[in-house]
Amino acid sequence: MRKFFTLLWLLCPVAAVYYHFNEGKNEVARIQARKHVEQIRGMERAKEPDWAAIIEEYDKLSAELPKTEAPLVRHQIRLAKSKAQLELLDVAGSIEELTSLLRECAQTHGEDAKITRATREMLGKAHYYATYLLKTNGAAEEEWRPFAERTRQIFRFLAEHQEPGALEKYEDRVAAEFNKTINK
């Protein structure tokens, strides 16, 4: 029994070195990326966020992730970056990025995945912003009408393909908030 524990004690450094040179680097990169995400979220919560700096930080975050990182994480970062682009009113760039991201998400995760749905919602918002900006700047109807139609199609698709109990959950939340407000 004594030999077994001695052998086990001598093999511990081998296991630690193996982990350090294989999965350890990726884990350290993930921890740094997590801290970077917290920093970016703090920048987003600022009273007047600098969206250009936030977009740059998302680019840096994408670069510092390990190559073997799950596609879901990369898609979430791209979605957050597209949201920042929309806040900066780079509507055309955001629509282009969201369209390619939607294709990738649908192929990788499926049409009903949360990330695919979130991307589709953000794409609908981007088309709505494009419609609004074109209309308020006096563009002809032929220019803004395709964006309005695409917005309608996206949100109709989302409404038709929602979870079966989503509407009831939403109504329950609204009723609970309403009751809380009345009881105060």
Regions of interest found by a model, annotated:
Residues 2-78, 83-90, 95, 162, ...:
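N-terminal alpha-helical interaction modules that lie
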Residues 21, 28, 69-70, 112, ...:
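Short coil/turn linker motifs that delimit alpha-helical repeat modules in TPR/alpha-solenoid proteins
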Residues 43-46, 91-108, 128-177:
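Short coil/linker segments at helix-helix boundaries
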Residues 52-56, 74-79, 117-120, 141-149, ...:
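Short, charged, amphipathic alpha-helical segments
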Residues 96-99, 117-121:
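Carboxylate-rich helix-loop segments that flank metal/cofactor sites and access channels
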